[in-house]
């Protein structure tokens, strides 16, 4: 059974060209945003009786990917494996992009801006309907990836 969140998102995406733009640009937005968030890390130590039992160096990109994986799994348990693969590829590729590409932040910001511009072009010129984020920004960011 499809959720009301899916219907909300679906009503803004009927044009084939706009859907095609979204097919390429939404993953690029998620990927570039993950690249940006990967650069924000949190170093944590969990001590027990004065000894480190867990040391993590987790970046915000991973936290967001885990959040989305949990959200989609909660909505429909059948989405776990596809979203695990999708978000795993997004996270790992963005992590290694940052690791091996000089000025990766600049590239990620440019890709993000370009992808957002393409989204609006898709809605304004092809869909001829405003983007879903105008009506509900939270629904848009929850359903988009």
Q: Which residues are covered by each model-predicted region?
A:
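Membrane-proximal soluble regions of multi-pass membrane proteins
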Residues: 3-8, 12, 124-145
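Membrane interfacial helix-start motif at the N-side
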Residues: 6-27, 68-78
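Hydrophobic alpha-helical transmembrane segments of multi-pass integral membrane proteins
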Residues: 25-36, 110-114
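Juxtamembrane "helix exit" motif at the C-terminal ends of alpha-helical transmembrane segments
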Residues: 31-49, 88-99
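Structural signature of hydrophobic alpha-helical transmembrane segments
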Residues: 47-62, 106-110
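Non-cytosolic membrane-interface motifs at loop->transmembrane helix junctions
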Residues: 52, 103-107, 131-138
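Transmembrane alpha-helical segments that form the membrane-embedded catalytic/substrate-channel core
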Residues: 65-78, 83, 96, 111-128, ...
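Cytoplasmic-side transmembrane-helix entry/capping segments in multi-pass membrane proteins
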Residues: 80-89, 136
């Amino acid at each position: 059974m499809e959720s009301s969140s899916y219907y909300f998102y679906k009503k803004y995406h009927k044009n084939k060209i706009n859907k095609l733009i979204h097919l390429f640009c939404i993953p690029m937005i998620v990927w570039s945003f993950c690249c940006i968030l990967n650069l924000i890390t949190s170093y944590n130590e969990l001590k027990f009786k004065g000894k480190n039992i867990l040391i993590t160096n987790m970046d915000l990109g991973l936290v967001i990917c885990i959040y989305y994986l949990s959200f989609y799994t909660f909505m429909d348990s059948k989405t776990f494996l596809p979203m695990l693969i999708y978000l795993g590829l997004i996270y790992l590729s963005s992590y290694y992009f940052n690791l091996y590409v000089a000025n990766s932040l600049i590239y990620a910001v440019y890709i993000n801006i370009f992808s957002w511009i393409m989204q609006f072009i898709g809605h304004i010129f092809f869909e001829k309907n405003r983007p879903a984020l105008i009506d509900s920004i939270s629904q848009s960011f929850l359903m988009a990836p």
